[in-house]
Amino acid sequence: MQEQPLALVTGANRGIGREIARQLGERGYHVMLAARNAAEGIAAARELGLEFTPLDVTSQASIDRLAGSLERRKLGLDVLVHNAGVMFRHFDPEVARDTLAVNFFGPERLTQALLPHMRAHARVVIVSSGLGDRSALAPALRARFADGALDRPTLVALMEDFVARVAAGDHQAAGWPSYAYAVSKIGATMLAQVLARELADDPRKPRFNALCPGWVKTAMGGEGAQREVSEGADTAVWLATQAPGGPTGGFFRDRAPASW
């Protein structure tokens, strides 16, 4: 019988993800520290006394192996933190494809694969960004994201449309910005909302929320950033450890609802 609550944190070999994993471990969770870079992931897990699990969120085969491992071990998931992310300084069709693959499609597919293994009152936390601001979209496109009836298949189709239009060279005419990271985080924040609506009647009562960690001193954020990783991880851990009946479908910064 599973005694400890189980948490899985993606992109946890360094930075904010590593700190989230560390804090959850200190709170009594059995933490699966997931990372694509096996060498860094194994080293981080060993140092923190956690379990390493290999995971490439862009690979359906890798996702399926993880889900299969939970099934074989008869483990139920209490917390899933989507932290893995990439940001490129330039913009082209390859960047659009690769950014969305990690920052949006990875969390969407991983959540779907792990939903059958989630226990009652599971919390799914998406590390998004304030840069994912819907004001970057043209008004007609922005209205589609603001539609309270937007569902997951339609959201996925919108994200696929962005990638396809960048490849075709007409994304701006369709209302998209030339900033793949921003679009990916708009999608990631929206994913928490549509999942909360989609699973509102699930008897397990799962909770789905997204957050902005702020500008954090990590490999992505750089040394000029204003926040330490402990500050960047704080709201994610707070959402991951909410009591049953906590918020769902929200976007948070510094433990408070935020506009985007």
Per-segment meaning from a language model:
Residues 86-93, 120-201:
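Catalytic loop of short-chain dehydrogenase/reductase
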Residues 99-100:
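A hydrophobic alpha-helix adjacent to the NAD(P)-binding/active-site core of NAD(P)-dependent oxidoreductases
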Residues 1-32:
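Canonical Rossmann dinucleotide-binding motif of NAD(H)/NADP(H)-dependent dehydrogenases/reductases
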Residues 46-61:
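Rossmann-fold cofactor-recognition segment
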Residues 109, 206, 210-218, 222-260:
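C-terminal helical subdomain
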Residues 27-43:
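Conserved glycine-rich Rossmann-like NAD(P)H-binding loop of the short-chain dehydrogenase/reductase
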Residues 10, 77-85, 121-129, 209:
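Rossmann-fold scaffold of SDR-type NAD(P)-dependent oxidoreductases
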